[in-house]
Amino acid sequence: MSLASTSAVPRAATALPPAIYLLSLCSFAFGLCEFIAAGLLSPMARDLHASVAAAGGAIAAYALGAAIGAPVLTAMLARRPTRQVLLATMAVLAAGSVAMAAAPALGALLGVRFVVGLAHGVFMAVASHAATSLVDPSRAGRALSIVWLGLTLALAGGVPLGTWLGAVSSWRAVFAAIGVLALCGGAGLRFAMPAARQEAVAASTLASLRAIVQPPLLLAAGVAALVSVATFSFFTYISPFLLQLSGLDAGWLGAAMLCFGACAIGGNLLGGHCADGARADRSAMLALAALGLNLLGFYMLRAQPLAMLALCGTLGLLFFALVTLSTMRLLGLAQQHCPGSDAVAAGLSIAAFNAGTAAGGALGGVLIVAIGLPSIAIGGALAALLAMLLLWFQSQKLDAPL
């Protein structure tokens, strides 16, 4: 992906470029489009004359598109100017959101969400690379965390707001509003994002595709995937865990989700600062150890409501810190082993987290059936331990001790 022109952007010692915050706004719009479906499943299913289970395919279709689009389409678009790719993905989001609002049947909705998911994967990959290229290396982690903050805010605040709007108006109006937000974000990027001038900076399409299968990048992506497996083998079933095992009521459950969302925002920013202030590998190892202990805490303290609130908060903090740290690790490895493929590396991170989320949900379901609901916390902790072992193995292989 060509980003040579970003060298022309003044790099202030204190403030991040405005384009970083616009990228965050755009990632918020994409995140809202992805996550809002979970809060709108019932009215969508009713309006489209489908079952809730069938309507749940709207979530899977989007995630599948993002997982494919992030590494593969990003590699295929490696030679295109960054601003052009970003604007094209925002146009897809705007048009796709309007198409969702007007969808006459579930099949049409699923198809549109898959296409928008493809654009989502490309946008987050290219935006992640662009953010780190717009600032000095010493602030790359913070810039990346601001871009990803948009997704975190969409999950923590945008989804409850959108669910409420869907209840008082209609789910179609919510998607139409996302389309307007996408247009505003794209218009801002049109003026704030510098135009590319040197196409030779980016790797060729073939070289970018080869980067996807580079062993160092695959190992780092494996760590990222295990982070998601550890988190979502538990978090996917957090509602029955808290309601049935901890004795919390709906009010406490809402408070727990609020703690998760609020701390997730802090975790996103913390991950960026840790990536800038110390080696990302060492910070990731410490965060993984804390994640494993956090999940063990859910198992051991499940009868303590206040402990559950605190642990929900630290789960959000640690997971989103690891999202930023893992992406920075992949970007750093790409610079060492396949220069010019940074955006593809960011896409590989996105695909890994999406795959890990799906695998984590499946693992949790298997554990519940085979052992019981409490076991999901133990399963998550073991996945965190596996991530630590894989990270340690990679550090030894690269002769870069933690």
Question: What residue spans do the PLM features occupy?
Answer:
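Cytoplasmic helix-loop-helix junction between adjacent transmembrane helices
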Residues: V112-G150
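A late C-terminal transmembrane helix in Major Facilitator Superfamily
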Residues: P339-A370
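Intracellular juxtamembrane helix-capping segments at the cytosolic ends
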Residues: F123-V135, A321-H337
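Helix-loop-helix hairpin linking two adjacent transmembrane segments in secondary transporters
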Residues: L106-A108, P137-P194, Y237-F241, D249
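Paired small-residue
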Residues: G96, G107-V116, L306-T314
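Helix-breaking motifs and short loop linkers at transmembrane-helix boundaries and internal kinks
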Residues: H49, P81, A102-A108, G247, ...
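Helix-to-loop junctions at the C-terminal end of transmembrane segments
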Residues: G69-P81, G267-R279, I368
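Conserved MFS/SLC helix-loop-helix module at the cytosolic interface between two early adjacent transmembrane helices
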Residues: I68-L106
